[in-house]
Amino acid sequence: FRGLAKLLKIGLKSFARVLKKVLPKAAKAGKALAKSLADENAIRQQNQ
């Protein structure tokens, strides 16, 4: 059981490291997506 806990800790640490690398990219992609959606909405409203 102790070995399992150790493995879990190591897994969580590496997972956190991956998250730290991925999160900023995901946040940037999310912002870009939100902006393009907002732009599309604005264009649609102008066309009406």
Swiss-Prot record:
Keywords: Antibiotic, Antimicrobial, Cytolysis, Hemolysis, Membrane, Secreted, Target cell membrane, Target membrane, Toxin. Its main location: secreted. Coiled coil: none annotated. GO terms for molecular function: toxin activity. It is found in: Secreted; Target cell membrane. GO terms for biological process: defense response to bacterium; killing of cells of another organism. The keyword Thylakoid does not apply. One of its GO terms (cellular component) is membrane. The keyword DNA repair does not apply. Belongs to the cationic peptide 02 (oxyopinin-2) family. Disrupts cell membranes, particularly those rich in phosphocholine, through formation of pores. Has antimicrobial activity, hemolytic activity and insecticidal activity. This is M-oxotoxin-Ot1b. It comes from Oxyopes takobius (Lynx spider).
